[in-house]
From Swiss-Prot:
PROSITE patterns on file: RIBOSOMAL_L2
Domain of life assignment: Eukaryota
GO CC field: chloroplast; mitochondrial large ribosomal subunit
Keywords: Chloroplast, Plastid, Ribonucleoprotein, Ribosomal protein
Intracellular or extracellular location(s): Plastid, Chloroplast
Family: Belongs to the universal ribosomal protein uL2 family.
Subunit structure and binding partners: Part of the 50S ribosomal subunit.
Native organism taxonomy: Eukaryota, Viridiplantae, Chlorophyta, core chlorophytes, Chlorophyceae
Region listing for Disordered, in residue ranges: 222-269
GO MF terms, alphabetically ordered: RNA binding; rRNA binding; structural constituent of ribosome; transferase activity
PANTHER family attached to this UniProt entry: LARGE RIBOSOMAL SUBUNIT PROTEIN UL2M, RIBOSOMAL PROTEIN L2
InterPro entries xrefs: NA-bd_OB-fold (IPR012340), Rib_uL2_dom2 (IPR014722), Ribosomal_uL2 (IPR002171), Ribosomal_uL2_bac/org-type (IPR005880), Ribosomal_uL2_C (IPR022669), Ribosomal_uL2_CS (IPR022671), Ribosomal_uL2_dom3 (IPR014726), Ribosomal_uL2_RNA-bd_dom (IPR022666)
NCBIfam families linked to this entry: rplB_bact
Protein name (Swiss-Prot/TrEMBL): Large ribosomal subunit protein uL2c
Amino acid sequence: MGIRFLQAYTPGTRNRSVSDFSELTDKNSTPEKALTVSLHRAKGRNNRGIITCRHRGGGHKRLYRQIDFRRDKIGVTAKVVRIEYDPNRNARIALLRYEDGEKRYIIHPRGLNIGDIIQSDLNAPILIGNSLPLRNIPLGAEVHNVEFQPGSGGQLARSAGAMVEILAKEGNFVTIRLPSKEIRLVSKNCWATVGQVGNIEAYNLTIGKAGRTRWLGKRPTVRGSVMNPVDHPHGGGEGRAPIGRSRPVTPWGRPALGQLTRKPKKYSNTLIVKKRKK
């Protein structure tokens, strides 16, 4: 992937950068129709139309591409047909055609090219795009799309540039380092895909203007200190007044900005060797 920096023709293009989409097979191609479904987004509302999650709404209409996170066609090889853009994630997706004719989408790993042959197998070779259990992947290998529980489908390291490093194997568990630098244990029977997720420069893009964020379906975030007291606990006062409390709180009065939100006795605490860096 490359980044294209726009000239300051208008205030909206000043300091703005976009992807050049050079890794895509065809910039004007349409997605595989059998693998797409309509996407109804709730825009942060519940069944009564009341806002339950703020700062959501609008955005461009999208089709959802059904991604194969399980990689459960064991022993059947597949050929990479094309690499496509997916508006629902910052990673690219790759269209596979299996030997039996079935087509599926997967997250595109960095270095996977059109025409490559990949597979999912218990003893698949350690090649980019192949999927196999963690117990059969050597130490130090970089993987993505890692399962939390055997058979649950990949849940870890699916965004652009993400990868998980295998550190150790002991008993029924494998020690891994997550993108957040958290070190934790997962079952050795969990499956993962070899390689790092592509589009590694996605986080170097500069949005450039507010409207581009609205295209993504994100609405503005208003500070509580500029609201009225009826709208937020931080609101009110004369001029630029402080929040007037011993600590920051949410619009509903719960502690915020530094308050730990993870349950202290959560069952998975015993599997975390080292907490993530904040």
